[in-house]
Structures are given as C-alpha cells and as structure tokens.
C-alpha cells in the first residue's frame, strides 16, 4: 500500500498549519500519510515513502537551514527517491518575499533526486504559498495540493 509523508520546518506555526492541511487532504484522499516536523525526520527515512512533501518558511528567498540540511543529506542517498512523488510549499512574511524561489529550490533538489513533480494549472502552480497565517485561499490550495499528490501517488503505486 502506498504511503506519504509531509515534512516541515516552522517557527511561527504558519508552515506547520499548511503541512497539517496537506497531510489531512492526502489521508482523506486515501493515501496513508504522516505529518512530521523536520527534527523528527532523517534522510534515511524518506525512501520508505512513495510521496514526500516538504514545507519551509522563506528565509532570504531560500529554504530554512534545517530543510536545506535534510536536502543536503539526500546527496549520499542519491537514487533512492527516484520515481517517488514530490511536492513543496512555503510561507513568508511578505508578498514577494521569496516563497516561490523557496519552493523552486526544494523542487530542484527533488528533480535531481529523480522524483516525479506535478505542477498545477490552477492557482498554486509550483506549490502552495502563504503570506503570514494561511487564509482561506491558501487553505484551499493546500487541500488541492494534498489531493493531487495523493491521486498521483495512488496511480503510480497502486
């Protein structure tokens, strides 16, 4: 049976809230999914999942240090995530604060790892982005991303 994980780093709670919404949507869509803060996850854990979703606040247009550390740890496990489904999301303090570049940085690492990334033709093309606390629009984008990740994962790993 396919399974997923949503991994996040959050200081203010905004990224955590987004992670919980995405994980719930994945579970509700029939993909058994765990939601864990990044300090409870090691790179060795990730190959056991068929879908890996990573969330980070935006710091200077980049992923937070703990998220970058996890991504860097994947180098020694190169190929172990090949063919798995990947997705990313981010929160920031300001409009234009760099959330898209944060998400793209995570997605770039996933692509190098051989992961399957699905864009979205509606709304959050690269992944859900929040400015501050997630509002209703962001909550809907998180739900949609979780549903789409679950659907793709179940198709690839029946």
Question: Model-derived features: where do they sit?
Answer:
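FMN-binding flavodoxin-like domain, especially the glycine-rich phosphate-binding loop
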Residues: 2-4, 10, 14-158
């Amino acid at each position: 049976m396919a399974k997923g994980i949503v991994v996040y780093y959050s200081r203010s709670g905004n990224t955590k809230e987004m992670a919980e919404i995405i994980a719930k949507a994945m579970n509700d869509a029939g993909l058994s999914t765990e939601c864990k803060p990044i300090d409870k996850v090691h790179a060795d854990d990730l190959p056991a999942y068929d879908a890996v979703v990573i969330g980070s606040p935006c710091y200077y247009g980049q992923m937070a240090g703990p998220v970058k550390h996890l991504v860097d740890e994947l180098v020694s496990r190169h190929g172990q995530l090949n063919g798995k489904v990947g997705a990313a999301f981010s929160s920031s303090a300001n409009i234009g604060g760099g959330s898209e570049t944060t998400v793209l940085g995570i997605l770039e690492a996933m692509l190098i790892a051989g992961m399957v990334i699905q864009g979205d033709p509606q709304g959050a093309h690269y992944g859900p982005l929040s400015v501050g606390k997630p509002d209703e629009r962001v909550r809907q984008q998180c739900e949609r991303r979780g549903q789409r990740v679950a659907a793709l994962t179940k198709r690839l790993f029946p």
